[in-house]
C-alpha cells in the first residue's frame, strides 16, 4: 500500500443486520468512495434501496462520517482490535417527498369527518 500504511478491513452493517464485506481498503480511501462501493454491492432483494451515495450515511463509533474525509481521518482507534474488522453501520436516508405532491396535498380541500363511533 502507498506510504507503507496497512490496509483497513471494514464491513458494512445494513439496517436489517446483514453485512456487506468485509473488504480491505487503503487508509486514503474517501468515505464517498466507500459509499460507492456499498451502492454497487447493495443486495437486490432489499425493500429499501439507495439511488445515490447521498442517500447513504455511514456511522462509525456513533459518528456520521463526512463524504470528503478519508478512512484514516474517520477512524476511531479506541476499542479497535489490531488487525480486526471495523464494523460501520449504513443508514439509508428516506426518500424526499416530491415538492409538487406536497403542494397538491396542501392545496387539497380538507374533509371534516368524525372518526368516532358512539355505541
Swiss-Prot record:
InterPro entries recorded: MUB, Ubiquitin-like_dom, Ubiquitin-like_domsf, UBL3-like, UBL3-like_ubiquitin_dom
Q: Which keywords does the record carry?
A: Cell membrane, Lipoprotein, Membrane, Methylation, Prenylation
Query: In this entry, which stretches build a coiled coil?
Result: none
Please give the function described in this protein's UniProt entry.
May serve as docking site to facilitate the association of other proteins to the plasma membrane.
Q: Which organism is it from?
A: Oryza sativa subsp. japonica (Rice)
Pfam families, alphabetically?
A: Rad60-SLD_2
Per UniProt, what is the membrane topology?
A: Lipid-anchor
The record's annotation in SUPFAM superfamilies points to: Ubiquitin-like
Matches recorded under PANTHER family: UBIQUITIN-LIKE PROTEIN 3, UBIQUITIN-LIKE PROTEIN 3 HCG-1 PROTEIN
Q: What is this protein called?
A: Membrane-anchored ubiquitin-fold protein 3
